[in-house]
Amino acid sequence: MFKTVAGLFGSVAASSYLFAQTVEAKGDNIPQTDVPALTEDEFDRGNKIFQQRCAGCHGVLRTGATGPDITPERTRKLGYQYVKDFITYGSPGGMPNWGTSGDLTADEVEIMARYVLSDVAQPPDWNLSDIKTTWEVNVPPEKRPKKKQNNYNLENIFSVTLRDTGEVALIDGDTKKIITVIMTGYAVHISRVSASGRYIFVIGRDGKINMIDLYMKVPDSVASIKIGMEARSVETSKFKGWEDKYAIGGCYWPPQYVIMNGDTLEPLIVEGTRGTTYDTYEYHREPRVAAIVASHYRPEFIMNLKEIGKILFVDYSDLHNLKTTTVRAERFLHDGGFNFSKRYLLMAANARNRIVVVDTKEAKLAKIVDVSIKPHPGRGANFLHPKFGPVWATSALGDEMISLIGTDPDKNPQHAWKVVETLEGQGGGSLFVKTHPKSKNLYVDTALNPDEDIASSIAVFDIKNLNKGYDVLPIGDWSGIKEGMRRIVQPEFNKNGDEVWFSVWNAKSQESAIVIVDDKTRKLKHVIRDKRIVTPTGKFNVFNTMHDVY
């Protein structure tokens, strides 16, 4: 199956093509297949797996976004065996090979094939009354330490997502030792750091937020809350005079955001995001809140409304008279980050193959830039190009290309908001690119590529000599682990910018690790192998996250 997909579609976004375009091309010529029945227990298992593994790309209601529409109207035309094979083998365009990687058992693959042929489950809403029942303050502010009670270099701590165990590991970046492992929500998507640097806020895909106090002798969660059934984003207020006052969380389901007290996570307001698409003005039931960032120019949170293509500037200076500014941008907004000046925000509209540039000082759209197939930058990578000046880089899920966009409209206006150069990487399935102001290297992962050699290694470019192409670092081999896919995901620098950390992400039943590379020499420096490091994915250095260094 994989050879067939690769041969027909190469590095294009094959998952979208196969699940969407094939139906359009053949339509009713594909025979209707009877839906194999699911028992109640099987449906519950399938629904749980879908929410944990699939909803992020395909949507809670399965109507598609980064991934294609997989409602039964489409999947039944493809048929059970076709769907089962696709789940098993994946595609070079970003669809993981759930079966051959070992992430799902053969039984689970079979259940999921039947699940996506079945009618869509309607999830419940999650209102303020529901949210309040989950709110817990384990350590009230008045009982927390007045000053730091440990000897850790807080700015060089890494918060590491342990995806499938519902935990984060805090790792000392100086000693490479695990400080503690903290129970959180399931599959923490991101860690964000308060303006003061004292607190780490983490949010699980199940909508649970934990607030971790780094001043404690052993850092731990001091408050928690569940803001929805499915979520991806959390942020804190950072504008001068408003530091640490508020936190905000954005939900995939229900489509809403919640602003909370920054000391306790007490929910203060809940605002729904349902509305019309920016272009066709069609009402949408599921405009999910994707990335949220804190403005450097005024007391505002800036958030992406994925399906409807709008970016909201939410003024948190007066919650009782809430003011929002809506920027009409592009549909299927996902993630992104600031340029070097932190004035302009670049966000990926990945299903539209575009990057949206927003001027956060003026709260206006600056430009929309066409890039390669399904851009997925994480927060992107800023560096000084030897020819074009400051650029921001994004890799892609759908092909092997890395797009470099000029980001200096003041001193290099001729290059601003244009793709000034395109680099060719190892393949599709990339989730993150990363560099550092002190680094001469640009690192590109390919974690979701179905080719094991590509998924288990990293491409690295010399910023001063991009024409040379990339070198390959065999991170999976360096880990010493022999089993599994050993997907290498999310390069992350330490505070000093002289080390880069990589997650070696295996299935829950297999060994995983963290590999640390000397940035200057590109040589292996250290491997963290510990039975507590289970399915590590995202890693967030406190200093770099707090100061938007990427």
For each predicted feature, which ranges?
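Electrostatic cytochrome c docking/interface patches
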Residues: 22-49, 143-146
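Short loop/turn segments immediately following beta-strands, especially the blade-tip
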Residues: 212-217, 260-268, 315-319, 360-364, ...
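Loop/turn-rich, solvent-exposed surfaces of beta-rich toroidal or solenoidal domains
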Residues: 389-393, 400-402, 427-509
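Structural signature of eukaryotic scaffold interfaces centered on beta-propeller domains
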Residues: 135-152, 192-195, 234-243, 282-297, ...
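Asp-box/WD-like beta-propeller blade repeats and closely related beta-sheet repeat scaffolds
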Residues: 226-307, 320-328, 333
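Structural motif
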Residues: 167, 209-211, 255-259, 309-313, ...
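Extracytoplasmic electron-transfer domains, predominantly the class I c-type cytochrome c fold
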Residues: 36, 40, 56, 61-65, ...
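A short beta-strand motif characteristic of beta-propeller blades
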Residues: 177-182, 218-225, 266-271, 275-282, ...
